[in-house]
Amino acid sequence: MDFNTVSSFQVDCFLWHIRKRFADNELGDAPFLDRLRRDQKSLRGRGSTLGLNIETATLAGKQIVEWILKEESNEALKMTIASVPSSRYLADMTLEEMSRDWFMLMPKQKVAGSLYIRMDQAIMEKNIILKANFSVIFDRLETLILLRAFTEEGAIVGEISPLPSLPGHTDEDVKNAVEVLIGGLEWNGNTVRVSENLQRFAWRSRNENGRPSLPPEQKWKVARTIGSEI
């Protein structure tokens, strides 16, 4: 097993432990708690894939971090922080909307890269809006935390979430997954809109209906893919 893969997992486990202690003292805000919950699932998936015990990895990660801090000067730390671009967290959904349980009458699901797409194909002829919580860097979507599709009544009818066992995705991965979800919902006569944040940071262009602009042949391809695969 690659040494860097193991040590990276160990450090991630220890840093998650520190963040959890911080949250336990009621010091974390909503974006912080969102990321903490998602990262916990990701670490469990990575641990299962690597065959590593999380508690043991956390202790090993502590030793690595302590060694780094012992060698790190305050001046070097300042230079490192200054050189790293900062990301922003954008939230279309409240914490309640993100954590709410939902069920599907006609469940359909699909894995697209490292993203998991779910939708209820029993939903027909509804007005639906896609909301997402994600981070942005250089005015582009960096990391999707969670995307959900809501009806006007507030019911959840679709979702895109990162797979814990396959961390890492690009803004193009998210765009492709959203197009699959939109195609599946529109297949049943629903009208789908995308939140302003998603329009701005995931797509550079949009149409008057508030959804990403797709060429006709791509719309047809997406719809056909949904009908046969999802």
From Swiss-Prot:
Upon interferon induction, ISGylated via host HERC5; this results in the impairment of NS1 interaction with RNA targets due to its inability to form homodimers and to interact with host EIF2AK2/PKR. A motif (Nuclear export signal) lies at residues 137-146. GO terms for biological process: symbiont-mediated suppression of host cytoplasmic pattern recognition receptor signaling pathway via inhibition of RIG-I activity; symbiont-mediated suppression of host gene expression; symbiont-mediated suppression of host mRNA processing; symbiont-mediated suppression of host PKR/eIFalpha signaling; symbiont-mediated suppression of host type I interferon-mediated signaling pathway. It is found in: Host nucleus; Host cytoplasm. GO terms for cellular component: host cell cytoplasm; host cell nucleus. Pfam families: Flu_NS1 (PF00600). A motif (Nuclear localization signal) lies at residues 34-38. It comes from the Viruses. Coiled coil: none annotated. GO terms for molecular function: protein serine/threonine kinase inhibitor activity; RNA binding. InterPro entries: NS1, NS1A, NS1A_effect_dom-like_sf, uS15_NS1_RNA-bd_sf. Residues 180-215 are annotated as: CPSF4-binding. Keywords: Eukaryotic host gene expression shutoff by virus, Host cytoplasm, Host gene expression shutoff by virus, Host mRNA suppression by virus, Host nucleus, Host-virus interaction, Inhibition of host innate immune response by virus, Inhibition of host interferon signaling pathway by virus, Inhibition of host PKR by virus, Inhibition of host pre-mRNA processing by virus, Inhibition of host RIG-I by virus, Inhibition of host RLR pathway by virus, Interferon antiviral system evasion, RNA-binding, Ubl conjugation, Viral immunoevasion. Inhibits post-transcriptional processing of cellular pre-mRNA, by binding and inhibiting two cellular proteins that are required for the 3'-end processing of cellular pre-mRNAs: the 30 kDa cleavage and polyadenylation specificity factor/CPSF4 and the poly(A)-binding protein 2/PABPN1. In turn, unprocessed 3' end pre-mRNAs accumulate in the host nucleus and are no longer exported to the cytoplasm. Cellular protein synthesis is thereby shut off very early after virus infection. HAMAP family: INFV_NS1. Belongs to the influenza A viruses NS1 family. The dsRNA-binding region is required for suppression of RNA silencing. This is Non-structural protein 1. It comes from Influenza A virus (strain A/Swine/Wisconsin/1/1961 H1N1). The lineage of its organism: Viruses, Riboviria, Orthornavirae, Negarnaviricota, Polyploviricotina.
